[in-house]
Amino acid sequence: MSLSKLAKQIHTEEGPKWWVDLETGLPKDRNPGEMLMLIVSEVAEAMEGVRKNLMDDKLPHRKAEEVELADAVIRIIDYCEGRNLDIAGAVEEKMAYNRNRADHTREARLATNGKKF
């Protein structure tokens, strides 16, 4: 499935939970900062899973790291769809840009003060 199609599916399924006022059924104006921090919290939960080598409590056959990162991806994609951001196009462009980034080369990373991670 393409990222664009996945984005539409995620927003169709998740959108009513986050973008609609549960009491009125009307569209809800979400705080972008709050939503971005919810993404950060999913990544933090993934880190906790790595740190403690945990399995997920809801999907016990999967590592917590994997499930929390899936939550982060779902939140990112839903956020982008809800704010009319072309995440698929941005990912494609960013990957193309990164292919030729001077600071991503082996030589640049090995250089003094090069990116180590």
Stretches found by the model and what they are:
Residues 1-117:
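Flexible "arm" and connector segments at domain edges
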